[in-house]
Amino acid sequence: MKLALSLILFAAWIVSVGPARAETIKIGVVPGAYADSVEALIPEAKAEGLDVKLVEFSDWTTPNVALQAGDIDLNYFQHKPFLDNAIAQRGYDLVPVGVGILSNIGIYSLKHKDFASVPNGALVAIANDPVNQGRGLLLLQRGGLIKLKDGVGFKGSIDDIIDNPKHVTFKEVEGPQLVRITPDVDLALGYPHFIVAAKAFDPSSGLIYTGIDDKQFAIIFTARRDRADSPALKKIVEIYHRSPKVKEAISKAFANDPKLYTLAW
């Protein structure tokens, strides 16, 4: 009887001190390199007591809304200038907690082989958010298609164009949707990882690209300010930076072409 009671008590003790329940971390992402690379860290995070759940979004507004509301713990889809603009517009209390991929963006055309071939009155698709629109316009300026007011930098908009010799017109599109509209326009701003994910066309066929000089546009892990010092969130970023599986997923998401991205950490 004493032996049976001892076994019962021992079993109860084992249950009470058994494996700690994994902490669930919900990370908001958009499809492509960001989702794929975060998904790659899930097994390593699980081994360290973190149960990572991906929440995919199809736009660039909802991930910050969801984060501010506490529906997710992190998001990973935006760069610092984009976050700064969102905070200024919406009053979010969000902060960066880690840096990730620097995605080099490009100008693509399925109709013209270079900027010189672009006809008068051409239609150009460009991002509709303030920061990424400015980045696209700077690329078009580098390509000789337009000229912007001095000093506007990446904060420039279509209204800041002061010279447009070919009288091109612009179609403003939500960033993730640019890949779908590319066949229907003369030129389009493009994000290589979205192009790869959509299997739309060759992501290495851009007429011009941004580069490492654009490091301020590296994608960041973002959290609510009150959770910025969370050990679990810091661990996610640490695993992301060190994991070979993450690096493999990033390379694959960019068609294994190193000119399309940079590891910014």
Language-model regions, residue ranges each:
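Pocket-flanking alpha-helical
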Residues: 60-92, 106-108, 113, 136, ...
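Beta->alpha turn/N-cap motifs
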Residues: 32, 56-60, 70, 74-84, ...
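A conserved helix-loop-strand patch within extracytoplasmic ligand-binding domains
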Residues: 97-147, 247
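Periplasmic-binding protein-like
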Residues: 132-141, 240-261
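Short helix-initiation/N-cap motifs at beta->coil->alpha
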Residues: 54-65, 152-180
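Short, well-ordered beta-strand elements
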Residues: 23-32, 50-56, 123-124
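A bilobed periplasmic-binding-protein/Venus flytrap-type ligand-binding module shared by bacterial periplasmic
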Residues: 104-115, 217-232
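Ligand-binding "clamshell"
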Residues: 85-97, 111-112, 184, 189, ...
